[in-house]
Amino acid sequence: MLPRAEQKQQTRLALMDAARHLMECGRGFGSLSLREVAKTAGIVPTGFYRHFADMDQLGLVLVSEVGQTFRATIRLVRHNEFMMGGIIDASVRIFLDVVAANRSQFLFLAREQYGGCLAVRQAIGALREDITSDLAADLTLMPKLQHLDADGLHVMADLIVKSVFATLPDIIDPPAHALP
């Protein structure tokens, strides 16, 4: 038998997996009910409250999770670009592979950045700003961009990050033509 803390963590992860599973079946986070998430996770609805105060808190934890994955991906890309002298094609491949490996997380991110839950939208907006700031700092290290000031680099980073976020739906469910 598992220790209580480990069992609690497994149930918490089961609730997160259940929410992602329901969203992979075509549902938006805002349309999920606490009862159906709990049922899908195999627990009674009142058990949900041992792990999350409400559905908004579950959504915020899901944003945090995809944020960690996204930022770890950016670190891989950064390592490829700066440490290994990588090329853009390789960096794009790294990103696409991570999105494919974590499809449910990125599906959540793609859908909920404009979804119905205000707290989740705000958390995703903050994540996008953090990623933009990280990228702007990285861009200062690129010799080809030395002529740009901090504001110019931030605008460039903002455009790149917003483009990536906007194209997530096509990356997750590509149109008929194949991705690189």
Regions found by a protein language model. Give the residues of each.
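Short helix-capping/turn signature of helix-turn-helix
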Residues: 52, 111-116
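Generic hydrophobic, amphipathic alpha-helix propensity
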Residues: 7-19, 37, 62-70
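Amphipathic C-terminal alpha-helical segment
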Residues: 98-101, 137, 157-179
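Helix-turn-helix
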Residues: 14, 25-57, 61
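N-terminal intrinsically disordered/low-complexity leader segments
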Residues: 1-10, 149
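Hydrophobic alpha-helical connector segments
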Residues: 75-101, 157-160
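Amphipathic alpha-helical packing segments from all-alpha helical-bundle domains
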Residues: 118-144, 154-161, 165-166
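Alpha-helical DNA-contacting segments of helix-turn-helix folds
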Residues: 59-66, 109, 131
